[in-house]
Swiss-Prot record:
Residues annotated for ATP binding in this entry: 23-24, 65, 68-70, 131-133, 174, 184, 221
Identification of the protein by name: Holliday junction branch migration complex subunit RuvB
The enzyme's E.C. designation: 3.6.4.-
Head domain (RuvB-H), as annotated region: 258-336
Subunit structure: Homohexamer. Forms an RuvA(8)-RuvB(12)-Holliday junction (HJ) complex. HJ DNA is sandwiched between 2 RuvA tetramers; dsDNA enters through RuvA and exits via RuvB. An RuvB hexamer assembles on each DNA strand where it exits the tetramer. Each RuvB hexamer is contacted by two RuvA subunits (via domain III) on 2 adjacent RuvB subunits; this complex drives branch migration. In the full resolvosome a probable DNA-RuvA(4)-RuvB(12)-RuvC(2) complex forms which resolves the HJ.
Region Small ATPAse domain (RuvB-S): start-end pairs: 185-255
Signal peptide: none
Stretches for region Large ATPase domain (RuvB-L): 4-184
Species annotation: Cronobacter sakazakii (strain ATCC BAA-894)
GO molecular-function terms, A-Z: ATP binding; ATP hydrolysis activity; four-way junction DNA binding; four-way junction helicase activity
Amino acid sequence: MIEADRLVAPGSIVAEEVADRAIRPKLLEEYIGQPQVRSQMEIFIQAAKLRGDALDHLLIFGPPGLGKTTLANIVANEMGVNLRTTSGPVLEKAGDLAAMLTNLEPHDVLFIDEIHRLSPVVEEVLYPAMEDYQLDIMIGEGPAARSIKIDLPPFTLIGATTRAGSLTSPLRDRFGIVQRLEFYQVADLQHIVSRSARHMGLEMNDEASLEVAKRSRGTPRIANRLLRRVRDFAEVRHDGVINQHVASQALDMLNVDAEGFDYMDRKLLLAVIDKFFGGPVGLDNLAAAIGEERETIEDVLEPFLIQQGFLQRTPRGRMATTRAWNHFGITPPQMP
């Protein structure tokens, strides 16, 4: 299955990136939600600026769509420096990373998305760069090969990952600041939807923004995506005016239910309930039953279902909770 086919998939879609950039917050004062992260970053950034230092290297982790890239942009804006962006899979060779590092200005931010996917060769080059602001490069081949050191300007590496556990210990230990992004509260998502609606010039009331927020799975990227589809519906059917009834109609038509579930969420939960009698069921069996890759279940589908209390991950496998049974109007089996 292709994750991008899902309207509520938290992953980024290329066609949305330009539109999302236009409505992203640029500074911490505009940043909504994640209060602990925001307050800590305010202190760390202000302290670095007072000292005239580069900000310590920053690792941001959490489920997709929660604003890791947005936070990296905010850090660069607050520090008043350039942001250079790349990703783990793109940096195939040590020379790819070396080219980026040697082009940095003092205190610049280098943002590496999916940093857990760095190759070991590239990661080895990163260690002295992060720790000593030095680049070790091998010149020549065979017996004539020699290592030279290149001094780098002080810089900030921001790494983003959905799989912090996949990082090697040496890499993880070199980050001075580690921030975990959590799923957003509905009230914060409502503020995000309202802010995006204003930027898009939409006529939308508070009840409508709340309706979109409640179905956005705690994820700003999904909230903005649903908002754009609600806008389309309103423009065609309701002269562009978005109230709670219009938003609800649009989202129902898009097959996004009151919990923010789409057909894949319902398919997973119903597979556990119907095919495995509520579980426990192993991940491989569950992946085969719904025709998905186990990584997609672990990284994309499960986190929200577990966080919302519809699915349990146990040593024996996945289990549907009473809340999941009730969601589908099915009576859960009585415990012996």
